[in-house]
A protein has these predicted regions:
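The feature represents the first ordered module of a protein
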Residues: 1-62
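Short, compact, well-ordered microdomains
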Residues: 68-95
Length: 95
């Protein structure tokens, strides 16, 4: 499977958290996802993932929020970025 990098972002927050997002365009969907993107996005502090979005093979599109996993409906790369930023902002507001 050939992949082309669409975007990559990584930042360290003042409190030491790491925010990272990577999206690739793939030639074939990552089953069971039906779109042509492979992605991973995570917000972690001290190595503990608090927020994550990805489409791991066999699991499809899903997100992680403080250890719980739920389905995620992928609409577009732009919407993924908005949803990820909103989830990170909500998590950072808790601390």
């Amino acid at each position: 499977m050939k992949a082309r990098l669409i975007t990559r972002f990584k930042d360290v927050t003042p409190e030491g958290g790491v925010i990272e997002l990577v999206v690739w365009r793939v030639t074939e969907p990552i089953s069971p996802s039906e779109h042509g993107f492979k992605y991973r996005a995570a917000y972690a502090i001290d190595g503990v993932r608090l927020v994550g979005f990805d489409n791991e093979r066999s699991k499809g599109d899903h997100c992680h929020m403080r250890g719980s996993e739920r389905r995620y409906t992928f609409v577009s790369v732009e919407q993924l970025i908005e949803d990820f930023i909103a989830a990170v902002d909500a998590e950072r507001a808790k601390t």
